[in-house]
Amino acid sequence: LKFLGFEQTFKNALTTLPMGGAKGGSDFDPVGKSDAEIMRFCQAFMLELWRCIGPDQDIPAGDVGVGGREIGFLNGMYQKLAREYHTGVLTGKGMTWGGSILRPEATGFGALYFTQHLLHEAGKDIKGKTVAISGFGNVAWGAATKAIELGAKVVAISGPDGVVAIKNGITKEMIDYMLVMRASNRNKVQDMADKFPKDCVFTADKKAWSIPCDIALPCAFQNELSEEDAKELKKNGCWCCCEVSNMGCQPDAIHFFQNNGVLFAPGKAVNAGGVATSGLEMTQNAEHLSWKAEEVDARLHHIMESIHEQCVKFGRQVDGHIDYVKGANIAGFMKVAQAM
């Protein structure tokens, strides 16, 4: 948790927005819990937290296990305790309570914008490329949505129970069903294959990395991609991995990618679109305005382009190769150091 907070500080610095960075959480697992149980936990959590947060203090947002529902419960309890209404206390809120449009899918959208610029820098085009995605939550949903919008072909999504291979590429109808799967709390990706048996093939206890692809997008949780997975990806023809989940790749996997000609970009740069859009939500709250989807998307795209430019600036080696890990670390550190 401490290291995630450390990483968050540099990630927020990369966004160019005036935000610090921190991480927090609990060991409460919402899987299998009723709405009432989750609400009671969120209320109890906020009962201890509310004095430590505020629109000009610390501003929590969602992450693994915390989506719009949980943010809504937390926000409602805060307003009750504070006895005055503040829209900017949390981000990731519903639109009714001062949330920003596109916030749920922002991490995935931003990741694909970054990937698009990375490929362009390497002289490649994202159109027609095959993509494997781990997970089927908000991040994976956003990534899959933007991937097909940009012309890529998503050939695999995975969950705790296994992987679904989609030979002809994921469709809009399948992407919409990902939200139904997540809302069911079953946590089983096999439901996708059961819903679309003609297009999907489910394999139990396998990862998305077992499916041949051009681009791998870890979108689930930290340390999900091991060195063995990296080797399997390389063997199956993968030549690019963009880390969408926080610290999704184990250090040995990153070293393997870097030493074997696989383009790799770290999570602190790739997934910064989520926190960047939280920053945009804070701006809208401060202005008491709600922007249209086109404006939020355009600002997000601009931020991700800026992050990519910073990575290239600080990560370009003497031979012209770009070390995105080094570039992201130096760019983030430079801003934090200058602020201090």
Language model regions located:
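Glycine-rich phosphate/diphosphate-binding loop of Rossmann-like nucleotide-binding domains
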Residues: 91-94, 99-212
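Rossmann-like adenosine-cofactor binding region
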Residues: 162-264, 269
